[in-house]
């Protein structure tokens, strides 16, 4: 899918990987980039607007843990304004296994609920035009970082959900693929808590291994968007982009 002149909604488009991806998307010239995030960042929005003045960048506050009804209400505001939306990126995520319920709510349930809400506008069974969903999951959905089992399980669930969405495309008209970053130097990785403190040094241990920058990840993310392959399981690791078969695995080596 060419990004040029498209209308894109990006949930959590101001985070580490998210913000660099927003930059790369804006460079590609969409008509509209609508960013939904929990915390407003006027400086970041201003930077995106200055990067390509031809692109309309809009921000709405959004917490993915709200109800489907609340999300649907927000999306109606956006659809009423834009008329059409081509791509939804679900990017919200936290890495803190102290917060069990919130981890599941943000990383999995939030993705499911946001997707469920947009189906009201896209589902071809309701007369909708269809659409494309890119869900940011994780390589931990392939093989867990076992010291953060809650995070890993939430990402595995999001990946499974995305794979199902892709299989449902002939019914709904909505295609989907997953974006699965490897270890990336973001604030998410620099400091986080393992489950029950089973490994206090887990973040430090991970960063002892080769990583990638958020820019490398973002550039490959845009390539995946352009490829627009329904059902693709994209691995974005060590600055590379690979469409993997489910029989392949990834290991944290710690």
From Swiss-Prot:
It catalyses: a primary alcohol + NAD(+) = an aldehyde + NADH + H(+); a secondary alcohol + NAD(+) = a ketone + NADH + H(+). Gene3D superfamilies: NAD(P)-binding Rossmann-like Domain (3.40.50.720). One of its GO terms (biological process) is alcohol metabolic process. Substrate binds at residue 138. Its EC number is 1.1.1.1. InterPro entries: ADH_Drosophila-type (IPR002425), NAD(P)-bd_dom_sf (IPR036291), Sc_DH/Rdtase_CS (IPR020904), SDR_fam (IPR002347). One of its GO terms (molecular function) is alcohol dehydrogenase (NAD+) activity. Coiled coil: none annotated. It comes from the Eukaryota. NAD(+) binds at residues 10-33. Homodimer. Belongs to the short-chain dehydrogenases/reductases (SDR) family. This is Alcohol dehydrogenase 2. It comes from Drosophila arizonae (Fruit fly).
């Amino acid at each position: 899918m060419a990004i040029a002149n498209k209308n894109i909604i990006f949930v959590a488009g101001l985070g580490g990987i998210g913000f660099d991806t927003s930059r790369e998307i804006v460079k590609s010239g969409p008509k509209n980039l609508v960013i939904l995030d929990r915390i407003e960042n006027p400086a970041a929005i201003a930077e995106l607007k200055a990067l390509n003045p031809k692109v309309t960048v809009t921000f709405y506050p959004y917490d993915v843990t709200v109800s489907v009804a609340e999300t649907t209400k927000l999306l109606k505001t956006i659809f009423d304004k834009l008329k059409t939306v081509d791509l939804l990126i679900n990017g919200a995520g936290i890495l803190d296994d102290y917060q069990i319920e919130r981890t599941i709510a943000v990383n999995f349930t939030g993705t499911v609920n946001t997707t469920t809400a947009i189906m009201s506008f896209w589902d071809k069974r309701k007369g909708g035009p269809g659409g494309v969903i890119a869900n940011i999951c994780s390589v931990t959905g392939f093989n867990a970082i076992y010291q953060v089992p809650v995070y890993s399980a939430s990402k595995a669930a999001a990946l499974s959900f995305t794979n199902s969405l892709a299989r449902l495309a002939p019914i709904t008209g909505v295609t989907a693929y997953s974006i699965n970053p490897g270890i990336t130097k973001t604030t998410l990785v620099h400091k986080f808590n393992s489950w029950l403190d089973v490994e206090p040094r887990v973040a430090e241990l991970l960063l002892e291994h080769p990583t990638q920058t958020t820019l490398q990840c973002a550039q490959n993310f845009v390539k995946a968007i352009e490829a627009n392959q329904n059902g693709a399981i994209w691995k974005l690791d060590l600055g590379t982009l690979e469409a993997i078969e489910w029989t392949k695995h990834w290991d944290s080596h710690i």
